[in-house]
């Protein structure tokens, strides 16, 4: 996570937002899962939801967490209890667009492509999505207050085990 401290909402610049995303996706691609929850506020919303549900206004999600504590629990489950074949993920985000401001924070949107590689198989696309985020200044740095990942297909592979 970036060590640059930010002390005012006006500091939510395009460069600061881009640095946040670079750090976020780098952390995930490097499988530093224990660092992932720190990108979120204590009270946050993290949701991975099919496009059909999102557009209909339904909240039924494939994955959802409503606090940093819930995100930490997910990491614990991934690192200590779940069994799955070894794999690598690479995330390919587009540049984020600022689409609005809300309560001192900034709403952004960007596309995301997620590619999975199993050690003994060719790489495959496992997710095509649009990310709707609310970024705020919290404890002197940028964090996600909301991260809603809307994936295009109606189903995700069972193999999508890591955060997006």
PLM region spans:
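A generic "alpha-helical surface" signal
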Residues: 15-19, 27, 62, 69, ...
């Amino acid at each position: 996570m970036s060590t640059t401290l930010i002390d005012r909402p006006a500091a939510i610049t395009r460069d600061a937002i881009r640095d946040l995303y670079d750090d976020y996706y780098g952390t995930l691609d490097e499988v530093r899962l224990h660092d992932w929850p720190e990108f979120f506020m204590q009270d946050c919303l993290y949701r991975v939801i099919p496009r059909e549900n999102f557009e209909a206004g339904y909240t039924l999600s494939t994955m959802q967490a409503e606090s940093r504590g819930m995100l930490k629990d997910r990491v614990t489950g991934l690192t200590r209890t779940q069994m799955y074949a070894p794999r690598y993920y690479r995330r390919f985000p587009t540049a984020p667009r600022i689409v609005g401001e809300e309560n001192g924070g900034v709403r952004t949107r960007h596309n995301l492509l997620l590619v999975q590689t199993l050690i003994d198989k060719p790489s495959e696309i496992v997710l095509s999505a649009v990310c709707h985020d609310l970024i705020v200044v919290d404890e002197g740095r940028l964090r996600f207050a909301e991260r809603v990942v809307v994936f295009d297909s109606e189903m995700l592979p069972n193999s999508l085990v890591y955060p997006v």
